[in-house]
């Protein structure tokens, strides 16, 4: 039996099924860094460590050992089916007869990263910027369509010491289509625990990322709340009509509507000058989830339409 086992981004994310498969395996094969990360749970096993870049030889060896009657585990970080060993193994076994294979899913880097960043995922696309196996022209096309489709974009292999052009192209396309204020979450897993940063696209620099980084690019509705990225999925967040709105309508129907800033309002000033307190009669107020640029003022217990990009303008 050949077991393709995803160990997730760290030992603490291994599934119970994967742990049992490791325990049942006679031989463990994998990239040295991944093997070392689970060394304490594979003690007593025959372990074969390989270097980066010899994935084909690693796969052939695992198949050969399994055909000899061994129960073999080949290790993949994250999930084996997401830029992992599963694809390669299934290409290789076409040359052989009677190779029994089972895949054990793992927590993918994109899911792990998204959870650290908050709740940024909605409809999303996953793109690797590595052009070792994929032409740059194809990567460019995928980036353009994902950006135009307003997908959240999870980016694997964003950059390396010798491979910078795909990242530069990626950033240029996103700036042109999405704009400089687009939120980007960076999860750097080069060390443990992983480090997270959230920046605007215009602030995303080459020196801030590496080959172990996973990027989560927000869409047009993604916003920042309490340091977390959030992409609303369309849930209706119901809010009672605020007393300030009721007060406005009472004055409106009595012909006593204030013009300009309402200096008598106990909440004034709660937003930028020039909006003339129009949040009080906005038919969508309070919009409730922050996706339009508004924000909740905790100390005043009121919703501010400052920076709202949906209905209001600063003109």
Model region roles, listed by residue range:
Residues 148-243:
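A contiguous loop/helix-start segment that scaffolds small-molecule binding in enzyme catalytic cores
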Residues 1-101:
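Class I S-adenosyl-L-methionine
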Residues 10, 82-149:
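Class I SAM-dependent methyltransferase SAM-binding "motif I" and its flanking Rossmann-like core
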Residues 243-315:
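Cysteine-centered metal-binding/redox modules
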Residues 7-13, 134-136, 197-199:
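Short gly/ser/thr-rich secondary-structure transition/capping motifs
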Residues 5-6, 74-77, 127-130, 155-156, ...:
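Short beta-strand segments
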Residues 1-5, 70-76, 124, 149-155, ...:
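Generic beta-sheet signal
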